[in-house]
């Protein structure tokens, strides 16, 4: 009987030791798993923070880029408005010249534009007080001295003209209205006007 008891005791001891080994191993594995999980959590947190910072930087860059584009757009709009204002102002100054200066300007413009001196001149109703028959007489005398016909005369035709004139012959029309001349030269003049308005 004692032999059986000893065998049982031995088996119990071995079972207890094995149980303890299993428990220790399980505890060790659990600790390793927890440590690994903790490290992974720290790594994931760091990666998430890194990604969040990257996203934040990208968003900031986008916002700044959009803001810069908006600022540039507003600047260009303001610049264009000032250039427009400069050209409108130039046309107003031409239209509001003193009668004598206006006549002198038109006189020189007709002499420069006349092809053979045998054209009709179309003017606005408002300009008929400034562009007078006497002015055309002066023009025709000067044209004759240049060897041209000297037969510039008023046309009965009416056009929507603010200032300046249109010379018309049987074959050609020469538009010397102020708004047209400014429009034609605007592209060339715009660069110079912009330089004057915005030079630093």
Swiss-Prot record:
Superkingdom of this entry's organism? Answer: Bacteria
| SUPFAM superfamilies with a match to the protein in the record | V-type ATPase subunit E-like
Presence of keyword Nucleotide-binding: no
One Gene Ontology biological process: proton motive force-driven plasma membrane ATP synthesis
Among Pfam families, the record links this protein to: vATP-synt_E
Alphabetically sorted, this entry's keywords are: ATP synthesis, Hydrogen ion transport, Ion transport, Transport
Q: In the record, what terms sit under GO molecular function?
A: ATP binding; proton-transporting ATP synthase activity, rotational mechanism; proton-transporting ATPase activity, rotational mechanism
Example GO CC term: the record gives: proton-transporting two-sector ATPase complex, catalytic domain
Summary of the function given for this chain in its UniProt record: Produces ATP from ADP in the presence of a proton gradient across the membrane.
The similarity annotation says: Belongs to the V-ATPase E subunit family.
Q: What is this protein called?
A: V-type proton ATPase subunit E
What is the native source organism of this protein? Thermoanaerobacter sp. (strain X514)
Name of encoding gene: atpE
């Amino acid at each position: 009987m004692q032999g059986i008891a000893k065998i049982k005791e031995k088996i119990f001891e071995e079972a207890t030791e094995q149980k303890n080994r299993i428990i220790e191993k399980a505890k060790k594995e659990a600790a390793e798993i927890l440590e690994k999980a903790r490290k992974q959590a720290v790594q994931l947190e760091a990666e998430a923070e890194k990604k969040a910072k990257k996203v934040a930087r990208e968003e900031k860059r986008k916002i700044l880029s959009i803001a810069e584009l908006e600022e540039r757009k507003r600047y260009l709009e303001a610049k264009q408005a000032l250039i427009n204002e400069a050209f409108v102002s130039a046309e107003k100054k031409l239209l509001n010249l003193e009668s004598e200066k206006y006549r002198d300007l038109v006189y020189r413009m007709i002499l420069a534009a006349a092809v053979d001196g045998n054209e009709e001149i179309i003017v606005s109703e408002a300009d008929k007080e400034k562009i007078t028959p006497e002015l055309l007489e002066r023009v025709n005398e000067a044209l004759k001295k240049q060897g041209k016909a000297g037969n510039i005369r008023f046309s009965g035709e009416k056009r929507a003209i603010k200032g300046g004139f249109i010379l018309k012959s049987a074959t050609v029309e020469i538009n010397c209205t102020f708004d047209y001349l400014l429009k034609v030269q605007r592209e060339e003049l715009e660069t110079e006007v912009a330089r004057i308005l915005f030079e630093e």
